[in-house]
Amino acid sequence: MAEAASLTFPDGSVRNVDAAMTGADIAESISKSLAKKAVAYAMDGSLRDLSDPVERSGKIEIITREDPRALELIRHDAAHVLAEAVQELWPGTQVTIGPVIENGFYYDFARNEPFTLDDLPVIEKKMREIVDRNKRFSKEVWPRDKAKKVFADKGESYKVELIDAIPEDQDLKIYFQGDWFDLCRGPHMASTGQIGKAFKLMKVAGAYWRGDSNRPMLTRIYGTAWADQQQLDSYLQMLEEAEKRDHRRLGREMDLFHFQEEGPGVVFWHAKGWRMFQNLVSYMRRRLDGVYQEVNAPQVLDHSLWQTSGHWGWYKENMFKVECADEEAEDKRTFALKPMNCPGHVQIFKHGLKSYRDLPIRLAEFGAVHRYEPSGALHGLMRVRGFTQDDAHIFCTEDQLAEECLKINDLILSTYADFGFEEIQVFFSTRPEKRVGSDALWDHAEEIMGGVLEQIAERSGGRIKTAINPGDGAFYGPKFDYVLKDAIGRQWQCGTTQVDFNLPERFGAFYIDKDSEKKQPVMIHRAICGSMERFLGILIENYAGHFPLWFAPLQVVVATITSDADDYARQVTQQLKAAGLTAEADLRNEKINYKVREHSLAKVPVILVCGKREAEEGSVNIRRLGSRDQASLLLAEAIAQLIDEATPPDIRRAKA
């Protein structure tokens, strides 16, 4: 008798079927229309080929192209079609790897002559031909020796190397699309035709094989693929808008910062940019005042501390190190610039005996950290080697963990709201396979944080979306990640709350409990902005440089129409500064339209125009960024209005 499998469907119904039935068979048994639309199926959330037998009992879902999960399959299949197209057009080109990435895919090719942008339309045309052929995807499992021989005979040395890297106990899956085949874990859709035509090749770049600069340079072709043309068009439109908002371009136009070759990955802040940076720090300091103790730990520490923390073992290659001769010692000492603030904060906590009555202790730092990032990964303010973290570490008891996590959540959400971010997602990441701490410890922490996650959703009235990422926690404890959506729909992971079972134990941190016993504190890592530089990059792009008045690096420019108003413009500027506004006078002998245009391009929020009439009346003509409207006000009224507008939201709340 054939082995049976009990399948639970999305509507809750249960059916017993032959375990040898495939996903395609199950779809066909439900309806012919579903079978026609099906591209894959999921067993207990894991995607499979339609041709795979169900094999066992579980929860089953038939996946169609309308399902968001189908996007990964569309992109994966498009990468295979890209590789086939390239080898049809340029025989002898070696294919290497071609994964799905965010919003698309890429494939790396080994070819004597690198591809250029001019090649992309030709490749894209060939890809559409392959899609039209609608060849079936089929899977074979090959013995290791056969796979190596076949790929070696084809001249695919990179594939042979990949096969050697696959563990002996794993099957070697080969996927065919017609006569063309590739080494792949899968899964794939039923045929190339199911990819559709909503794809586009985007760019070419160089990439070292296996990311190793000592290995050959390959050509990487990037593409994007979507379920339909409307989604593709929306994505391309978003990219176009993102290009206009690129913080690197706006940083130049607004004279905020620059980078140069002598300091890769470190920021040269100009006066206006540094003022904006300080505005952010000042805002954050006000939010922490009275709740956190601001501290400052050394930037350079002996490597022995990093050995104790564990960073030296698993993070040493990403640290900046220096050897110094100690006059009193025979050997050189090795120091490192700190890549993170947490070990330093543990040292501060350990300095002096702590009682349970002292807890929670909340230590915050705007700490400069340095991490060695590959030069190819550097990207403006978004990915740098030297940056400032708005780091805090809370040392508390287990009983205080839930309350502290909720307080952190409230602070993070209100901070994001002050900067105009209302669409927030909170992801709860649970224990990974490799971790420290007992199962009982993880059970307790996950139970507490799971309850906090429910409260976050309830208290927001459903406005804050929450989700669980099983197995995605840090090795030292479970965590919350806060993801915000910007003005053009992009998502950015910024804030985090992480429970740490590791560092307090490694450093022997303890407090004295109510029974006069030593007890290890619960340590919480907390960041709101994360990297201050990156957060500023996000803000620049979110606002497209049109900052609210309270956060603008230069709030007001006083521009004269004629030299007759120069003295008055100087007086206006001084009064604005005396009122706490950042202001500059533009007294150049240029036409007023030229001045207005120049300052508008520099994204100055308010321009006060002064001519002979304004000087006589004691008034100003107000022009605002992005508006053609003009308004004449007496100077005192204008200043009062601007002071009110320039009041930061946290101060406004405190006054209410």
From Swiss-Prot:
* Protein name, entry field: Threonine--tRNA ligase
* Molecular function per GO: ATP binding; metal ion binding; threonine-tRNA ligase activity; tRNA binding
The cofactor binding remark recorded in the entry reads: Binds 1 zinc ion per subunit.
| Domain TGS: from-to ranges | 1-64
Q: What is one Pfam family matched by this protein?
A: tRNA_SAD
Q: Quote the EC number.
A: 6.1.1.3
Known cofactor(s): Zn(2+)
Binding-site list for Zn(2+) = 342, 393, 525
Q: What is its main location?
A: cytoplasm
For this UniProt record, give its keywords in alphabetical order, as a comma-separated list. Answer: Aminoacyl-tRNA synthetase, ATP-binding, Cytoplasm, Ligase, Metal-binding, Nucleotide-binding, Protein biosynthesis, RNA-binding, tRNA-binding, Zinc
UniProt similarity note: Belongs to the class-II aminoacyl-tRNA synthetase family.
Species source reads Chelativorans sp. (strain BNC1)
Protein role: Catalyzes the attachment of threonine to tRNA(Thr) in a two-step reaction: L-threonine is first activated by ATP to form Thr-AMP and then transferred to the acceptor end of tRNA(Thr). Also edits incorrectly charged L-seryl-tRNA(Thr).
Where is region (Catalytic) located? 246-548
Q: What class of enzyme is it?
A: ligase
Complexes and interactors? Homodimer.
Q: Does the keyword Nucleotide-binding apply?
A: yes
> What SMART domains does UniProt report for this protein, alphabetically?
tRNA_SAD
The GO annotation for biological process reads: threonyl-tRNA aminoacylation
CDD domains the UniProt entry points to: TGS_ThrRS (cd01667), ThrRS_anticodon (cd00860), ThrRS_core (cd00771)
Q: Which InterPro entries match?
A: aa-tRNA-synt_IIb, aa-tRNA-synth_II, aa-tRNA-synth_II/BPL/LPL, Anticodon-bd, Anticodon-bd_dom_sf, Beta-grasp_dom_sf, TGS, TGS-like
Q: Which reaction does it catalyse?
A: tRNA(Thr) + L-threonine + ATP = L-threonyl-tRNA(Thr) + AMP + diphosphate + H(+)
Q: Where in the cell is it found?
A: Cytoplasm
Write out the GO cellular component annotations.
cytosol
The family database entries (NCBIfam families) matched by this protein are listed as: thrS
